[in-house]
Design a protein with these regions (language model features):
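A short acidic, Gly/Pro-enriched loop at the edge of an enzyme's catalytic core
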Residues: 87-99
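A short SAM/SAH-binding and catalytic strip from SAM-dependent methyltransferases
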Residues: 97-110
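A short glycine-rich, Lys/Arg-flanked "PGG" loop and its adjoining helix->strand segment in the class I
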Residues: 112-124
Length: 204
């Protein structure tokens, strides 16, 4: 999957996904944890206000693709790469100012448990930045197709779930949802097109 990841997203990035990443990450700063950075498509969008960036990528093939991008940007701010996953996140409580997740929570074993871990490692007032594809509940026909295809899709696409309601799970994990935009991710199959993106805060 790592070998074809960037090629798979070329058209999607050009059709607006790259702009979404830039807008989401342009205002983050301080100590940042990104879970599941994959090949590092977010790296170019982190601003100089970041003082420390930890990239938690459990897939060794993704880490191999990530390494040269990290090396190219390491002079901007300290970057650490770890093989950590989210079950649990191996950092102390209240360790980070920001946690970033883009197209990750669809494929973790338990997205609700992952959100609780994200909440735990954020400092009070910290920001959770997210971009995730979700269940197309507003389109019954498409939602039925998601349900039918999901068992095979998970096996083909690295445990990617099509029917998760991550937009509902975020506030359920204790976050204050500040911004959540629901929009179609162009140049993708219809079953993964509906997305939610924005940010939520850990209450002070």
């Amino acid at each position: 999957m790592a070998a074809m990841y960037d090629r798979t997203f070329v058209k999607t990035e050009a059709a607006g996904l790259r702009d979404w990443r830039a807008a989401l990450l342009g205002e983050v700063g301080g100590e940042v944890l990104e879970i599941g950075p994959g090949t590092g498509l977010n790296l170019e969008h982190y601003p100089a206000e970041v003082t420390r960036l930890v990239l938690a990528e459990p897939d060794r093939h993704m880490r191999a693709k990530l390494a040269p991008k990290v090396e190219a940007r390491a002079a901007r701010f300290p970057i650490e790469v770890t093989d950590a996953g989210v079950d649990p996140i191996p950092f102390e409580a209240e360790s980070f100012d920001v946690v970033v997740s883009t197209l990750v929570l669809c494929s973790v074993p338990d997205h609700e448990a992952a959100l609780i871990e994200i909440h735990r490692v954020l400092r009070p007032g910290g920001r959770f930045v997210f971009l995730e594809h979700v269940a197309a509940v507003e389109n019954p026909k498409r939602h039925r197709w998601q349900q039918r295809i999901e068992p095979l899709w998970k096996r083909w696409a690295g445990n990617c779930h099509l029917t998760r309601t991550t937009d509902l799970a975020i506030p359920a994990a204790g976050f204050e949802l500040v911004e959540a935009r629901r929009e179609s991710m162009r140049q993708t199959p219809p079953i993964v097109r509906v997305t939610t993106r924005g940010y939520a805060l850990k209450p002070v």
